[in-house]
Amino acid sequence: MRSDIMKKGLEKAPHRSLFKAMGYTDEEIARPLIGVVNAANEIIPGHIHLDRIVEDVKAGIRMAGGTPVEFPAIGICDGIAMGHLGMKYSLASRELIADSTEAMVMAHPFDGLVLVPNCDKIIPGMLMAALRLNIPSIFVSGGPMLAGRLDGKSVDLISVFEGVGAVKAGKMTEEQLKALEDCACPGCGSCSGMYTANSMNCVTEALGLGLPGNGTIPAIHAARRRLAKEAGVRIMDLVSKNIRPRDIATLDAFKNALAVDMALGCSTNTVLHIPAIAHEAGIRLDLDLFNEISARTPNLCHLSPAGPHHIEELDAAGGIQAVMKVISKLGVIQESALTVSGRTVGENLEKARVLNEEVIRPLDRAYRQEGGIAILRGNLAPDGAVVKQSGVLPEMMINEGTARVFDSEDEAIAAILGGKIVAGDIVVIRYEGPKGGPGMREMLSPTSAIAGMGLDTSVALLTDGRFSGGTRGAAIGHISPEAAEGGPIALIREGDWIAINIPEKTLTLKVDPEELEKRKQEWKPKASQNLTGYLARYARLVTSASTGAIFKD
């Protein structure tokens, strides 16, 4: 066993003595030692209950003859970090989570791992660590929050974000916003729509590293606890057979994950995270692969913010396995891929079926014939940009307008809420990329303000930053190269004409090439922000959004 190097033999008597100081018996020490990575904390609704999930995981490990050893992971709540300096740390925390998990598992050589995340950057951080370490591993998430209810309608966190813009526009009273605030998030779990956390939990299941049901079983359902126990049991089989993450997360498995991403209409953050996770497995996922798979995979679900449904309804409709069963008819699912269940994808899908065709539509009634995400290119984004096309209104799929340029999110929010943005404008927010932000803040506050003020039918937003999974509308992010690297977005001037053509996958700055070259020669980097601490190191090490914003090798 891998753990033998820290517990077996005469010379390891001091090591065993330290285990005994914590109450472990000789029998427990002799068993396979399974690390249980617990991201529980009291600042994220999706993590507030993870201690309970972890206790169930540990029960499963003991049932199967192993010894669980729990250790923590940090976690940032993107919703609470939104719209202020804290958001600079969100994406940056992904690397901290991956690195600190690696450090713990290399310092203490466990035989296997059960990783228990639930929210935005914690899931990809742990996935990166698992593939980097490549010891037997399984994921079980905390599950999604239920949607709230107000006046007989489903509401969620994005309803509250958009409510702020509605109040500013005089379309809602502060009393109505308070009522919404009080009921939109009714309890524990990852926020209830197809936002980044739930997107990544669903991707984990599709990738084969989480059991069927991992992406959708609600946090408060007993089935979630049973799933956690099953994950604890399954890790022991994976350890005994030495089945490792890279045996499961192959190129075929990543293609499966991308196909599910497209069918569901997942968060654009998957375009950052999936390539970063694949990188740890030694697999390069080019952005063009997203468009290739999108062209073959229809969008079957309109989950909040793109539509009225929430993850609890997706679960009741058959979950991720049912979605995979439908799109497998198109040949976009590699059914021979192995999963942590011990079965192949195809074997898992044998019993899957759709129970509600309004939540998971059949192929002949797909919302659109392409997937939920599109990669755009053009003279404004030579290395690519991303849009959640499933959340864009039909009238905004092809759009031209006047550039309104802001060098930070804060400046843009002030202008939007101050009534300075009008129909036909294209809001450009730059110097918010991985290096320039640094940290690539999510632009949920400005996009929610645009939607809440009723401008989402006539105003687009472009940025080298990124978006929350809760963003809807003509919101195009990850523009690469970013402004801080002298990318074309840095050369846009107030009043320039910009053309967006999502069906043609183009993003064009309509400025004469000679003029652009002149501007490029005149461009100077922004003054230093005098960064200190982790953000300073992050800005030095991070690469482009087009490569997943990973660190330089």
UniProtKB/Swiss-Prot annotation:
Pathway: Amino-acid biosynthesis; L-isoleucine biosynthesis; L-isoleucine from 2-oxobutanoate: step 3/4; Amino-acid biosynthesis; L-valine biosynthesis; L-valine from pyruvate: step 3/4
PROSITE patterns: ILVD_EDD_1, ILVD_EDD_2
Cofactor, free-text remark: Binds 1 [2Fe-2S] cluster per subunit. This cluster acts as a Lewis acid cofactor.
Binding site for [2Fe-2S] cluster: C119, C191
Domain of life: Bacteria
GO biological process: isoleucine biosynthetic process; L-valine biosynthetic process
Function: Functions in the biosynthesis of branched-chain amino acids. Catalyzes the dehydration of (2R,3R)-2,3-dihydroxy-3-methylpentanoate (2,3-dihydroxy-3-methylvalerate) into 2-oxo-3-methylpentanoate (2-oxo-3-methylvalerate) and of (2R)-2,3-dihydroxy-3-methylbutanoate (2,3-dihydroxyisovalerate) into 2-oxo-3-methylbutanoate (2-oxoisovalerate), the penultimate precursor to L-isoleucine and L-valine, respectively.
Entry protein name: Dihydroxy-acid dehydratase
Organism: Syntrophus aciditrophicus (strain SB)
Lineage: Bacteria, Pseudomonadati, Thermodesulfobacteriota, Syntrophia, Syntrophales
